[in-house]
A protein has these predicted regions:
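Extracytoplasmic/periplasmic, Sec-exported soluble proteins
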Residues: 58, 62-67, 101-105, 123, ...
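Extracytoplasmic/secreted envelope proteins and their assembly/folding machinery
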Residues: 67-75, 85, 106, 110, ...
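Mid-length scaffold segments of soluble, non-membrane domains
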Residues: 104-126, 136
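Active-site-adjacent substructure of cysteine-protease-like catalytic cores
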Residues: 124-185, 221
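Short, flexible active-site-adjacent loop segments at beta-strand->alpha-helix junctions, enriched
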Residues: 72, 147, 188
Length: 222
């Protein structure tokens, strides 16, 4: 890949959903809450490399640009080069992948990563073990969550709580087996660099997107 910002072919995937993962926009359906898969015991207390990943964190520059910011974090980690959130915003806006008024459609999260040559998989109904295995393999993870539940866990008990935010999962800390933590780069809060949440709180916030995640990795050389 050369040094141009975006050098892969244009993507032709059409928008298939009107659901959004941004502030104030309601996702119309709630996902089934799968049981938290049992983890047989990681070789390391912390899965992933949160110390390296949190170097790329910053606050999102626009109210609804969380998914763009998370894709910037991931691209910088995997490609070992810097990107500008504003340049990514402009590129996404020109292709209708981002709307400043409503954010990023769930089907468009990851398209910026594909545009810079990364491999992307989008999945729903994942488990925390799926995330842990991806992190252990050096892959990067973006999840759709409800940010209000992350801040006020009791809100998970209210009906109609939907996904409205994107975060990067940068690690899972099993050093206390009775109280594992999920480590995030959350671009929407000032203390979001490497912020830690109890696993059960994260799962409640994550289930509002049907446990949706984008898994990104470098493409293997031909």
């Amino acid at each position: 890949m050369n040094n141009e910002l975006f050098d892969s072919p244009e993507l032709s995937q059409e928008l298939t959903s009107a659901e959004y993962l941004e502030d104030g926009v309601i996702r119309e359906k709630l996902g089934v809450d799968p049981e938290i898969a049992e983890w047989d015991g990681p070789e390391e207390a912390v899965i992933g490399n949160p110390e390296e990943a949190d170097d790329h964190w910053h606050l999102q520059s626009e109210r609804n640009s969380c998914a763009v910011a998370c894709q910037e974090f991931v691209a910088e980690q995997l490609l070992e080069r810097e990107f500008s959130e504003q340049e990514l915003i402009d590129y996404a806006k020109a292709r209708d992948w981002y709307d400043p008024a409503s954010g990023t459609s769930i089907t468009d999260i990851g398209k910026l990563l594909e545009a810079v040559g990364l491999r992307v998989e989008r999945s729903e109904h994942l488990t925390v073990s799926d995330l842990a295995m991806s992190l252990a393999e050096g892959e990067k993870v973006i999840c759709g969550v409800n940010n209000m539940i992350l801040q006020e866990p009791a809100l998970a008990d209210l009906p109609g709580i939907n996904a409205n935010h994107a975060v990067e999962v940068i690690g899972i800390d099993y050093s206390d087996p009775g109280n594992p933590k999920v480590i995030l780069n959350d671009p929407g809060v000032e203390n979001g660099r490497g912020i830690r949440h109890n696993l059960d709180v994260f799962m409640d916030a994550w289930k509002t997107s049907d446990h949706f995640a984008v898994i990104a990795s470098r493409r293997e050389a031909a």
